[in-house]
Amino acid sequence: MTLDPEGGFEQLMSMARGFQAAKMLTVAVDLAVFDFLDQPRSAVEAAAWLKADARAAGIFLNGLAALGLLVKQVDYFHNSEIASRYLVQSKDDYRGAILKHLEHTWERGWNDLQHTILAGSPQGVEPETWVDTRPRRDEEGVKAFIWGMDAVARDLAPQVALKLPLSGVRRLLDLGGGPATYAIAFAQANPDLRATVFDLPGPSEIARENIAKHGLSSRIDILAGNFLQDDIGSSYEKYDFIWISHILHSNDQRQCRLIIRKAAAALVPGGGLAIQDFFLNPDGYTPLGAAMFGVHMLACTPRGRAYTYGEVAEWLQEEGLAAPSLIPTSPEASVLLAAKK
């Protein structure tokens, strides 16, 4: 939310209370409340199923109903339409993984924001080894993050596929592709396209599962590695198009330039490079979503932040790409699209 200059103190109270609804939602997902309440149940039944205190369960369910996550009819509760669609684990459109990821970032990032602001980076994080050590120390958190990225991109990726110049592209690299959601959408929209998804070994296993689920294992390959350190596949084949989605914001400027340099070197002449991110305007604080995401990266990564589209455009041109165009892909994100000269 943004503040109304004409508004009163209640705006600040509303902002400060924002954590309450967020915590109720993530706790309900963690407890699988929505799985149980996809049919009407009483608070007593829910408490017994949850092995919870009956009084506490009743108060909690009424709070979820007040938020619109549950519907209450007399003494029975059941999922609202939106909760039933997105928050029941057995359903195809389940999106709870991203909510679990956001809860992890609260516990291990935002909760210690004051220290991070004073010290410059989160506690217990070694910038040079953060990417390699995180999967080993936090396997469940990484799994929630990668499937969460699928939850966020699932609706958007088919729309993005229609906005990119992929007609005629035969070899595409999805660099840092996570669950392969975008590679899947690009392959579905372009029958002649073959894709490679490059990411760390843990995310690569999730990508393999997701690709197989969509019947695209014969057209989408997996290449596991660390794109800051390893060859991204260009030593044996150049790519017609490289897609980099929501990768730069986790890295510092030196790392971002390295990523762009490696991508540019891996392209054929005339090949396209598309970078999607939460780009800031030149003023550095708009749009709101990008500015807030910049703080999110401050809280959760050793060196990440949001970048202006001008900064990234300059790096692209320094690596021999033409001046990029800016294509909005969602209310908060855009794509910088450039061709290799």
Residue ranges, per PLM feature:
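Alpha-helical subdomain
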Residues: 1-72, 166, 171-341
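Conserved Class I S-adenosyl-L-methionine-dependent methyltransferase catalytic core
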Residues: 2, 9-36, 41, 49, ...
